[in-house]
Amino acid sequence: MATVIAKVKVMPTSPEVEKEALKETLKELVENNDAKCRGVSDEPLAFGLYTVFVMVEMEEKEGGMDPIEEAMNALENVESAEVVELSLV
């Protein structure tokens, strides 16, 4: 089986969301879904908002990133989460 590397873009609900706590929550979520977190970074967006990017490594399987993406979208402080890059290694 191949290894999948995905970049997930996560938008918090507001600028008041604690950035480091959100990054730690996302890292734990990835690792609790049989995947490895290869990095979490943030970029300023506008008006105090920021975007968080999560690099995920996992074995290729049916359903792919869907369970992780859905779990991220279900988090209380997350407005949206979507896979923006996907590649096989």
UniProtKB/Swiss-Prot annotation:
PANTHER family: ELONGATION FACTOR 1-BETA. Belongs to the EF-1-beta/EF-1-delta family. Gene3D superfamilies: 3.30.70.60. Keywords: Elongation factor, Protein biosynthesis. Pfam families: EF1_GNE (PF00736). It comes from Methanococcus maripaludis (strain C5 / ATCC BAA-1333). Promotes the exchange of GDP for GTP in EF-1-alpha/GDP, thus allowing the regeneration of EF-1-alpha/GTP that could then be used to form the ternary complex EF-1-alpha/GTP/AAtRNA. This is Elongation factor 1-beta. SMART domains: EF1_GNE. One of its GO terms (molecular function) is translation elongation factor activity. NCBIfam families: aEF-1_beta, PRK00435.1. It comes from the Archaea.
